[in-house]
Amino acid sequence: LDMGHMVNAIAQIDEFVNLGANSIETDVSFDDSANPEYTYHGVPCDCGRTCTKWEYFNEFLKGLRKATTPGDSKYHEKLVLVVFDLKTSSLYDNQASDAGKKLAKSLLQNYWNNGNNGGRAYIVLSIPNLAHYKLITGFKETLTSEGHPELMDKVGYDFSGNDEIGDVAKTYKKAGVTGHVWQSDGITNCLLRGLDRVRKAVANRDSSNGYINKVYYWTVDKRATTRDALDAGVDGIMTNYPDVIADVLNESAYKAKFRIASYDDNPWETFKN
């Protein structure tokens, strides 16, 4: 996946997909009552980016739905997966379940159109804090109680705090998650981070008893770092410049081994060479 980073205004969906992204990441901020409120990052953010673009969350979902509904004038066939970077650190730990419930209601209504020809993209719920794992259970319970448990087929998970791989595995056990796991690793583009933990995540993904299905690395803006990440075997790279990732994927060394994922690829299935 060529993942566009920090896509928080509806107009940016077109912008990033047109540069080559087949996936986007969107920040979600919550109000004091754990309602998803804005798609907003705020200051500070990645070097070279405007930190303050925003929409109301439900309005963003409607724009995203149009971009991922075949036949809509705004439809992008290429856009197959969306990562919601859930900014839950503003919440108390005991609000995580409520945040999940409210998130599910918002998505059901505004993105999935109550199960009636809604947006088709796969969704990854990315949570920054292992203590907030009940967001997942709250989300699942709500889709089930609202009569749409089948939509969970479209939902995956990520814990984005660069925690020990073993601790993440234990947390998924507590949350009752047995698949659909993306593991992120990374740091803001203003700083450098090695690939040690990415390699551990890839090893877990490729082992017979690992919990990880896919690994992505963030935020990569340079060709050299893109090559290093691909050499380490990642499934996705998050970037401020999707055209840079697309260019590297076109280099002869990588063209033979990697391709841009399409909607027919299963994002929850570990790729076997």
UniProtKB/Swiss-Prot annotation:
Residues at which Mg(2+) binds: E25, D27, D85
This protein's record includes keyword Lipid metabolism: yes
Keywords in alphabetical order: Cytolysis, Dermonecrotic toxin, Disulfide bond, Glycoprotein, Hemolysis, Lipid degradation, Lipid metabolism, Lyase, Magnesium, Metal-binding, Secreted, Toxin
Enzyme superclass (EC): lyase
Cofactor section: Mg(2+)
GO molecular function: lyase activity; metal ion binding; phosphoric diester hydrolase activity; toxin activity
Disulphide-bonded residues: C45-C51, C47-C190
Entry annotation: catalytic residues: H5, H41
Cofactor note: Binds 1 Mg(2+) ion per subunit.
InterPro entries: PLC-like_Pdiesterase_TIM-brl
UniProt keyword annotation of Secreted present: yes
Location in or out of the cell: Secreted
Glycosylation (residues): N250
Record GO cellular component, one term: extracellular region
Reaction equation(s) it catalyzes: an N-(acyl)-sphingosylphosphocholine = an N-(acyl)-sphingosyl-1,3-cyclic phosphate + choline; an N-(acyl)-sphingosylphosphoethanolamine = an N-(acyl)-sphingosyl-1,3-cyclic phosphate + ethanolamine; a 1-acyl-sn-glycero-3-phosphocholine = a 1-acyl-sn-glycero-2,3-cyclic phosphate + choline; a 1-acyl-sn-glycero-3-phosphoethanolamine = a 1-acyl-sn-glycero-2,3-cyclic phosphate + ethanolamine
Family: Belongs to the arthropod phospholipase D family. Class II subfamily.
Protein name (Swiss-Prot/TrEMBL): Dermonecrotic toxin LdSicTox-alphaIB1bii
